[in-house]
């Protein structure tokens, strides 16, 4: 037993040594001191950061290699994450929470998150952060179609094309009541059909029509990435970061097409917060600082995820794989603060019109 204990102690010592050696050069002022406080906590609980989404696996790997602190994660969806935080309010279990920006603003408004300003906070645009740091955006992504050409003969070029009967039981997207991307899709269809945040019925009526025609194959609760990779989804409405990852990282290549709808689309900001009263606050702060550091933002970029820091360029090997800039000119601007205020109303309207609830 003593020999086993000695081996375990040696392993732990090695991990501690690796982590300490890894930060001889700080990513930001105060990193070493924060690490010293965090290393004695019990790991890190990161809510809604599924590893197949937004290149989170690369950030997990980078963080754990640098600090030797294990990350525990779940993949709930933005709305479900806020619900989870509310249920755990008197006994918080998460340290950080990640979500579509309107849900982050909602969590902050419900006093579920702590004020914390990570490194590079001043570089994040004012409209994409709470002034006190109760939430702040860390990346963006654009709504696109991803089409499996082995299952679909004619590539849809826009939202109206998806209403064609030839796409019967072909379209898959996420539930806007519980996921950020689902709500983003609702906003995108609204803008593409001439509506706005004061009149989201145009987009929801479109989704209701898509449902009524029988062209919706499934409305999912969590990310459909693995199902798409397995060839189970003909037309997937998702973010460009997922599309490029499927094409170039998962290796689907020319078997899929990525389409920015002709009528227009939107680019969605995603936010993260320090959970109020979380069990490992210093590890949470260390994680948030890592995400907003140049290194963390660079790892997003390597995975086709648009960093939030202005002027942050994609690596050359990644930039050349994006659709032409002319396609991205169809991306429309959204007032995200206002979007956060009408989310609940839009979710109820979608449930009523699309599902008849």
PLM features: what roles do these ranges have?
Residues 25-27, 226, 326-357:
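Conserved C-terminal helix/tail region of periplasmic/extracytoplasmic solute-binding proteins
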Residues 41, 140-144, 267-271:
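Short, solvent-exposed beta-strand edge segments and adjacent coil->beta transition regions
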Residues 1-41, 357:
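Short, low-complexity disordered leader/linker segments with a strong preference
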Residues 23-31, 39-58, 270:
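Extracytoplasmic "Venus flytrap"
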Residues 45-60, 72-86, 90-232, 246:
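Extracytoplasmic ligand-binding site segments that recognize negatively charged/polar headgroups
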Residues 215-277, 311-321:
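Extracytoplasmic/periplasmic substrate-binding proteins
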Residues 265-266, 270-334:
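Mature extracytoplasmic/periplasmic domains
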Residues 59-67:
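A short alpha-helix/helix-coil micro-patch that ends at or immediately precedes a cysteine
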């Amino acid at each position: 037993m003593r020999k086993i204990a000695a081996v375990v102690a040696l392993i732990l010592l090695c991990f501690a040594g690796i982590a300490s050696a890894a930060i001889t050069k700080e990513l930001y002022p105060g990193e070493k001191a924060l690490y010293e406080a965090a290393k004695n906590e019990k790991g890190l609980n990161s809510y809604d950061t599924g590893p197949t989404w937004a290149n989170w696996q690369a950030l997990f790997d980078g963080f754990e290699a640098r600090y030797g602190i294990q990350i525990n994660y779940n993949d709930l969806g933005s709305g479900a994450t806020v619900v989870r935080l509310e249920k755990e309010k008197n006994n918080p279990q998460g340290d950080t929470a990640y979500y579509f920006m309107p849900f982050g603003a909602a969590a902050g408004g419900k006093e579920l998150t702590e004020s914390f300003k990570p490194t590079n906070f001043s570089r994040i645009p004012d409209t994409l952060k709470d002034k006190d740091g109760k939430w702040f955006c860390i990346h963006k992504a654009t709504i696109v179609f991803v089409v499996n050409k082995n299952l679909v003969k004619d590539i849809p070029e826009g939202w109206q094309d998806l209403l064609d009967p030839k796409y019967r039981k072909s379209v898959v997207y996420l539930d806007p009541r519980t996921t950020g991307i689902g709500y983003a899709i609702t906003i995108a269809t609204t803008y593409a059909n001439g509506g706005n945040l004061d009149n989201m019925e145009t987009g929801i009526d479109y989704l209701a029509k898509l449902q009524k025609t029988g062209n919706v194959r499934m409305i999912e609760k969590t990310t459909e990435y693995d199902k798409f990779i397995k060839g189970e989804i003909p037309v997937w409405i998702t973010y460009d970061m997922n599309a490029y990852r499927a094409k170039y990282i998962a290796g689907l290549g020319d078997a899929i097409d990525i389409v920015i709808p002709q009528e227009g689309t939107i680019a969605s900001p995603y936010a993260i917060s320090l959970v109020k009263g979380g069990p490992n606050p210093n590890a949470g702060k260390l994680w948030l600082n890592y995400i907003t550091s140049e290194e963390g933002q660079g790892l997003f970029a390597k995975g086709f995820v648009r960093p939030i820091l202005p002027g942050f360029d994609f690596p050359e090997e990644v930039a050349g794989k994006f659709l032409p800039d002319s396609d991205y000119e169809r991306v429309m601007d959204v007032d995200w603060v206002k979007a956060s205020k009408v989310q609940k109303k839009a979710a109820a309207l979608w449930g009523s019109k699309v599902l008849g609830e």
